[in-house]
Amino acid sequence: SMRRMVAYCSSLQTLNVSGWDTSNVTDMSEAFAGCRMLEELDVSSFDTARVENFFGTFSGLEFVTALDVGHFDTSAATNMDSMFDGNFSLTTLDVSGFNTAHVQNLNRMFTNCQNLTELDVSGFDTSNVTTMDNMFEGCNMLAELNLSGWNIEKVESMRYMFSGDNHLESIGVDPAAFGRGNTEGM
Protein backbone atom coordinates (compact mmCIF):
# COMPACT_ATOMS: atom_id res chain seq x y z
CA SER A 1 0.00 0.00 0.00
CA MET A 2 1.10 3.55 -0.76
CA ARG A 3 -1.83 5.03 1.15
CA ARG A 4 -0.83 8.52 2.30
CA MET A 5 2.83 7.71 1.50
CA VAL A 6 3.93 11.35 1.44
CA ALA A 7 0.53 12.95 1.94
CA TYR A 8 0.22 16.44 3.35
CA CYS A 9 3.94 17.21 3.09
CA SER A 10 2.82 20.75 2.44
CA SER A 11 6.29 22.32 2.18
CA LEU A 12 7.88 19.62 -0.02
CA GLN A 13 8.91 21.18 -3.37
CA THR A 14 10.76 18.31 -5.05
CA LEU A 15 10.34 14.56 -4.87
CA ASN A 16 12.10 11.89 -6.92
CA VAL A 17 9.92 8.78 -7.22
CA SER A 18 11.52 7.42 -10.40
CA GLY A 19 13.00 4.36 -8.69
CA TRP A 20 9.90 3.32 -6.81
CA ASP A 21 8.66 -0.24 -7.44
CA THR A 22 4.89 0.05 -7.53
CA SER A 23 4.19 -3.29 -9.21
CA ASN A 24 2.50 -4.81 -6.14
CA VAL A 25 0.66 -1.72 -4.96
CA THR A 26 -3.14 -2.01 -4.77
CA ASP A 27 -3.90 1.17 -2.82
CA MET A 28 -2.56 4.58 -3.90
CA SER A 29 -5.20 6.56 -2.03
CA GLU A 30 -3.96 10.02 -1.09
CA ALA A 31 -0.35 8.96 -1.87
CA PHE A 32 0.65 12.53 -2.78
CA ALA A 33 -2.43 14.36 -1.51
CA GLY A 34 -1.93 17.82 -0.11
CA CYS A 35 1.70 18.15 -1.20
CA ARG A 36 0.62 21.56 -2.33
CA MET A 37 4.07 23.12 -2.85
CA LEU A 38 5.32 20.28 -5.06
CA GLU A 39 6.23 21.72 -8.45
CA GLU A 40 6.94 18.53 -10.37
CA LEU A 41 6.05 14.87 -9.98
CA ASP A 42 7.35 12.28 -12.45
CA VAL A 43 5.22 9.14 -12.18
CA SER A 44 6.01 7.96 -15.71
CA SER A 45 7.72 4.80 -14.42
CA PHE A 46 4.85 3.73 -12.14
CA ASP A 47 3.38 0.26 -12.69
CA THR A 48 -0.28 0.64 -11.71
CA ALA A 49 -1.66 -2.65 -13.05
CA ARG A 50 -2.77 -3.82 -9.59
CA VAL A 51 -4.00 -0.52 -8.19
CA GLU A 52 -7.67 -0.65 -7.21
CA ASN A 53 -7.91 2.55 -5.20
CA PHE A 54 -6.83 5.88 -6.69
CA PHE A 55 -8.85 7.97 -4.21
CA GLY A 56 -7.20 11.40 -3.95
CA THR A 57 -3.87 10.10 -5.27
CA PHE A 58 -2.83 13.48 -6.69
CA SER A 59 -5.33 15.76 -4.95
CA GLY A 60 -4.19 19.19 -3.89
CA LEU A 61 -1.05 19.39 -6.04
CA GLU A 62 -1.56 23.10 -6.56
CA PHE A 63 1.59 23.92 -8.57
CA VAL A 64 2.13 20.82 -10.73
CA THR A 65 1.43 21.80 -14.36
CA ALA A 66 1.62 18.31 -15.92
CA LEU A 67 1.24 14.73 -14.74
CA ASP A 68 2.38 11.93 -17.04
CA VAL A 69 -0.32 9.35 -16.33
CA GLY A 70 -1.02 8.45 -19.95
CA HIS A 71 0.61 5.05 -19.56
CA PHE A 72 -1.21 4.12 -16.33
CA ASP A 73 -2.81 0.67 -16.45
CA THR A 74 -6.06 1.29 -14.59
CA SER A 75 -7.75 -2.00 -15.44
CA ALA A 76 -8.00 -3.01 -11.75
CA ALA A 77 -9.26 0.38 -10.57
CA THR A 78 -12.61 0.66 -8.79
CA ASN A 79 -12.25 4.09 -7.17
CA MET A 80 -11.02 7.29 -8.84
CA ASP A 81 -12.77 9.68 -6.44
CA SER A 82 -10.86 12.98 -6.15
CA MET A 83 -7.89 11.56 -8.10
CA PHE A 84 -6.89 14.98 -9.53
CA ASP A 85 -9.03 17.19 -7.27
CA GLY A 86 -7.55 20.64 -6.69
CA ASN A 87 -4.82 20.46 -9.32
CA PHE A 88 -5.20 24.19 -9.99
CA SER A 89 -2.14 24.56 -12.25
CA LEU A 90 -2.55 21.42 -14.34
CA THR A 91 -2.63 22.50 -17.99
CA THR A 92 -2.37 19.07 -19.61
CA LEU A 93 -3.62 15.67 -18.52
CA ASP A 94 -3.86 12.59 -20.73
CA VAL A 95 -6.40 10.15 -19.32
CA SER A 96 -7.65 9.08 -22.76
CA GLY A 97 -6.27 5.56 -22.30
CA PHE A 98 -7.65 4.97 -18.81
CA ASN A 99 -9.50 1.67 -18.47
CA THR A 100 -12.47 2.49 -16.26
CA ALA A 101 -14.45 -0.72 -16.80
CA HIS A 102 -14.49 -1.60 -13.09
CA VAL A 103 -14.66 1.92 -11.67
CA GLN A 104 -17.70 2.65 -9.50
CA ASN A 105 -16.80 6.09 -8.13
CA LEU A 106 -15.78 9.09 -10.26
CA ASN A 107 -16.82 11.76 -7.74
CA ARG A 108 -14.68 14.91 -7.83
CA MET A 109 -12.15 13.26 -10.16
CA PHE A 110 -11.23 16.54 -11.87
CA THR A 111 -12.75 19.09 -9.47
CA ASN A 112 -11.06 22.50 -9.62
CA CYS A 113 -8.64 21.59 -12.40
CA GLN A 114 -9.21 25.17 -13.41
CA ASN A 115 -6.42 25.51 -16.00
CA LEU A 116 -7.23 22.43 -18.06
CA THR A 117 -8.39 23.53 -21.50
CA GLU A 118 -8.79 20.02 -22.92
CA LEU A 119 -9.76 16.71 -21.36
CA ASP A 120 -10.46 13.56 -23.36
CA VAL A 121 -12.73 11.28 -21.36
CA SER A 122 -14.64 10.06 -24.42
CA GLY A 123 -13.30 6.52 -24.03
CA PHE A 124 -14.27 6.11 -20.38
CA ASP A 125 -16.30 2.95 -19.78
CA THR A 126 -18.83 4.16 -17.23
CA SER A 127 -21.03 1.06 -17.26
CA ASN A 128 -20.25 0.23 -13.60
CA VAL A 129 -20.11 3.79 -12.26
CA THR A 130 -22.71 4.58 -9.61
CA THR A 131 -21.68 8.10 -8.66
CA MET A 132 -20.04 11.03 -10.45
CA ASP A 133 -20.93 14.00 -8.25
CA ASN A 134 -18.85 17.16 -8.87
CA MET A 135 -16.72 15.27 -11.41
CA PHE A 136 -15.86 18.34 -13.52
CA GLU A 137 -16.86 21.07 -11.06
CA GLY A 138 -14.67 24.16 -11.28
CA CYS A 139 -12.98 23.14 -14.55
CA ASN A 140 -13.85 26.58 -15.82
CA MET A 141 -11.41 26.62 -18.77
CA LEU A 142 -12.92 23.53 -20.44
CA ALA A 143 -14.95 24.43 -23.51
CA GLU A 144 -16.06 20.94 -24.44
CA LEU A 145 -16.30 17.38 -23.20
CA ASN A 146 -17.40 14.37 -25.21
CA LEU A 147 -19.56 12.14 -23.04
CA SER A 148 -21.63 10.80 -25.93
CA GLY A 149 -20.47 7.21 -25.48
CA TRP A 150 -21.01 7.08 -21.74
CA ASN A 151 -23.33 4.44 -20.32
CA ILE A 152 -24.91 5.89 -17.18
CA GLU A 153 -27.49 3.21 -16.48
CA LYS A 154 -26.03 2.40 -13.04
CA VAL A 155 -25.34 6.01 -12.08
CA GLU A 156 -27.37 7.03 -9.04
CA SER A 157 -25.99 10.54 -8.57
CA MET A 158 -24.46 13.25 -10.77
CA ARG A 159 -24.96 16.27 -8.54
CA TYR A 160 -23.05 19.43 -9.48
CA MET A 161 -21.18 17.51 -12.15
CA PHE A 162 -20.51 20.65 -14.23
CA SER A 163 -20.92 23.33 -11.56
CA GLY A 164 -18.88 26.47 -12.25
CA ASP A 165 -17.86 25.34 -15.73
CA ASN A 166 -18.58 28.75 -17.24
CA HIS A 167 -16.88 28.13 -20.60
CA LEU A 168 -18.35 24.68 -21.23
CA GLU A 169 -20.25 24.91 -24.51
CA SER A 170 -20.66 21.26 -25.43
CA ILE A 171 -20.74 17.98 -23.55
CA GLY A 172 -21.54 15.83 -26.55
CA VAL A 173 -24.27 14.06 -24.65
CA ASP A 174 -26.64 11.56 -26.14
CA PRO A 175 -29.96 12.86 -24.74
CA ALA A 176 -31.39 9.33 -24.68
CA ALA A 177 -28.60 8.14 -22.39
CA PHE A 178 -28.77 11.11 -20.05
CA GLY A 179 -32.56 11.42 -19.79
CA ARG A 180 -33.27 8.87 -17.10
CA GLY A 181 -33.93 11.00 -14.03
CA ASN A 182 -30.52 10.37 -12.45
CA THR A 183 -29.30 13.70 -13.78
CA GLU A 184 -31.04 15.76 -11.09
CA GLY A 185 -28.90 18.64 -9.88
CA MET A 186 -26.39 18.47 -12.72
Predicted regions and their residues:
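Negatively charged
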Residues: 1-186
